[in-house]
Regions:
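Short phosphate-engaging motifs
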Residues: 63, 75, 201, 244-245, ...
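ABC transporter nucleotide-binding domain
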Residues: 180-270, 293
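Conserved protein kinase catalytic domain
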Residues: 80, 124, 226, 300-304
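ABC transporter nucleotide-binding domains
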Residues: 6-11, 16-211, 218
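C-terminal coupling/interaction segments
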Residues: 3, 269-316
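A generic structural signal for secondary-structure junctions
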Residues: 84, 110, 230-231, 254, ...
Length: 316
C-alpha cells in the first residue's frame, strides 16, 4: 500500500505518562489526507501532549503512531522535516520583520533562490500582509501574528500541518479570517490537525475527537456526534426566573441534564414525552411565562453529555 492510500496519521493506543500522572491514556484514531481533524477538549485534556507526540517532540510511553508513514518514536526526524507545526506559544522572532521571519523559516527548510522567492510571495499574499512585510513582528496586532505564524509553518509546503490552539487570544474577526485560511488549506489538499477548546471552531472541522482527562471519549463528524440525541430530546426553556426553573426540574424523572445559560435553560430529556412534565413543574414553581421549545443539539451538549456518561461509568 502506498503512502497516498494510507491515512495521514494513525495512532494506536498511544499513552504518555509523567511519573504517576497519565496525560494521555490509550488513545487511537486515524486522520485522512485533506481532512480538518479537530481535537476538542478543555485545558489539561491531553491535547497538547498528543500533538507533541505526533510531531516527534515527545516519545509515547506506550502504543504506536505514524505520521505520513513514519513512526513517531523511531523516525521523529523524518516527521519533523515533512510537517508544519504551530505551537501554542508564539514561535516567531519579534525583533525581525515579517519578511525576515519568513526568509529565516524558509532557509531552515532548505528553500533558496527562486523557490524561496515564490514561497515568500505566496505566504505574504495568503496572510494578507503585503503592507506589513517590513514591519517588526512585535508591532503586529495579534490576528496578524497568528496568520504570519501559520504561513511560516507552511512555507515549505508540508502535506500536513499541526496547529495547537492556534487562535488563542485573538478577536472574533481575526479568528474567522484564520479559519478561512484553514478551510482554503484543506481545500487544496493539506491535512490539518487542530487542537481547540472552542465549540465554534470545532464545528468547522470535518471530524472531531472529544478528549477529557487524557481519554478519547467520542470521534465522528459533527452531524453524527449530534445524532446521539434522538429528535426532540434537547429543549430550551426561556423564563423570567431561570434559577427557580432549574431547581424545579433538575430532579424530575426523565431529566438527564440541565444547564443554565443566562436566562435560558438547556435541558436534555430521556425521551421527547418527558417535555410535558417540565412545562407543568416550571409553571407550578411560579414561572408562568415559561416558553419551551425543542432545539438542535449543539456540540457543547454532546461534549457535556459524553463527559457525564464517562464520569458516571467511572464512578460505578
Amino acid at each position: 500500500m502506498s503512502q497516498a492510500d494510507r491515512p495521514a496519521v494513525v495512532a494506536r493506543d498511544i499513552s504518555k505518562s509523567f511519573g504517576p500522572f497519565v496525560a494521555v491514556d490509550r488513545v487511537s484514531f486515524a486522520v485522512e489526507h485533506g481532512e480538518i481533524f479537530g481535537f476538542l477538549g478543555s485545558n489539561g485534556a491531553g491535547k497538547t501532549t498528543t500533538i507533541r507526540m505526533l510531531c516527534g517532540l515527545l516519545a509515547p510511553t506506550s502504543g504506536t503512531a505514524t505520521v505520513l508513514g513514519f513512526d513517531v518514536a523511531r523516525e521523529a526526524g523524518e516527521i519533523k522535516r515533512r510537517i508544519g507545526y504551530m505551537s501554542q506559544r508564539f514561535s516567531l522572532y519579534s525583533d525581525l520583520t515579517v519578511e525576515e521571519n519568513l526568509r529565516f523559516w524558509g532557509g531552515t527548510y532548505g528553500l533558496f533562490g527562486q523557490r524561496l522567492a515564490d514561497r515568500l510571495a505566496w505566504a505574504i499574499a495568503t496572510a494578507e500582509l503585503a503592507g506589513e512585510r517590513r514591519v517588526l513582528v512585535r508591532e503586529l496586532p495579534g490576528g496578524f501574528r497568528q496568520r504570519l505564524a501559520l504561513v511560516a509553518a507552511l512555507i515549505h509546503e508540508p502535506p500536513i500541518v499541526f496547529l495547537d490552539e492556534p487562535t488563542g487570544g485573538v478577536d472574533p474577526e481575526a479568528r474567522r479570517r484564520f479559519w478561512d485560511l484553514i478551510d482554503a488549506l484543506a481545500g487544496s489538499g493539506t491535512t490539518v490537525f487542530v487542537t481547540t477548546h472552542s465549540m465554534d471552531e470545532a464545528e468547522r472541522c470535518h471530524r472531531v475527537a472529544l478528549m477529557h482527562a487524557g481519554r478519547l471519549l467520542a470521534l465522528d463528524s459533527v452531524p453524527a456526534l449530534k445524532r446521539i440525541f434522538p429528535p426532540g430530546t434537547v429543549v430550551e426553556v426561556a423564563c423570567s426566573r431561570p434559577a427557580q426553573a432549574v431547581a424545579a426540574i433538575e430532579r424530575l424523572p426523565g431529566i438527564e441534564e440541565v444547564a443554565l445559560f443566562g436566562e435560558r435553560l438547556r435541558v436534555v430529556l430521556a425521551s421527547p414525552a418527558d417535555g410535558a412534565g417540565i412545562a407543568a413543574r416550571i409553571r407550578e414553581a411560579g414561572c408562568a411565562d415559561a416558553v419551551i421549545a425543542p432545539v438542535e443539539p449543539s456540540l457543547e451538549d454532546v461534549f457535556i453529555h459524553v463527559i457525564a456518561e464517562a464520569e458516571g461509568a467511572a464512578a460505578r
